[in-house]
Amino acid sequence: MGACVSTSRSTCSSKSNGEPVPLPCLGIGLCRQKRTKRTFSDHVVTLQHLPSIPNRVFTNGKSRTSCIFTQQGRKGINQDAMIVWEDFMSEDVTFCGVFDGHGPHGHLVARKVRDALPVKLQSFLNSCQSRQNGSDQTCFKGNSMKSDVGDLDKDGSIEDKLNSLWREAFLKSYKAMDKELKSHPNLDCFCSGSTAITIVKQGSNLFMGYIGDSRAIMGSKDNNDSMVAVQLTVDLKPDLPREAERIKRCKGRVFALQDEPEVPRVWLPFDDAPGLAMARAFGDFCLKEYGVISIPEFSHRTLTERDQFIVLASDGVCFHL
């Protein structure tokens, strides 16, 4: 499963050894038609409200600016989940995520994260905005960033505050998501989990948080007007030096099996199990005491006219197509 995210304003109509799947296209743009201005606080929702939320796509299909698609592979159940949520708290904000489950209940974990994570992100942002109302701190509605202190935008402080706000929201929502999975009464996440690659496009700003080995790749034009691929994420594999150091410090083990030497895995200190092929994931609580974490990598990027689209994809697309 993958996603192709347009960075323009124009509208457009797992498995560690996962099987190849067709690459879907998911275009995100900003519709030019006039719509009612809405702010972040207008979009606070609960899980019970999700089925009635407009501009939220999570199955094969399309909306006014996007289309998404996933297909069953050759092995077992399709454990991928995906979401595009246009007008996410504001008319020019779009949330997009791809989640690749693994383990016996990975498909359920991925779907749970798909539904709950954006709501948690929304809740943290709304809470932060509520605290800022009436103060001279930065507030924003959609693409505009405003402050009661006029000099802030001269030295970039407004952008810094916006970046800090989104970073905090991503970190807190990922932490809350993993905590909910751990205490869920009907979902066994002990040896099951999910990756996550999530992006928020707010005007020309791109905010991204991710765990696991699902990727974000941007298509951008170089000086010769040729399209080049720019990988925006790092595959958080167990053999990355910083990841391996943390895991070993927590008494976990990292090694590859003889019959697949190219796939490093995380193992318990006292047993050759479960063999997780990533260093960060939601769930997988059997390994959380041994170095596997759910803290996301966060990044911010200012999009330019050269940036054309972004592909979000699970490992079935990245490694096998």
Question: Could you tell me what each predicted segment is?
Answer:
Residues G2-L321:
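PP2C/PPM-type serine/threonine phosphatase catalytic core
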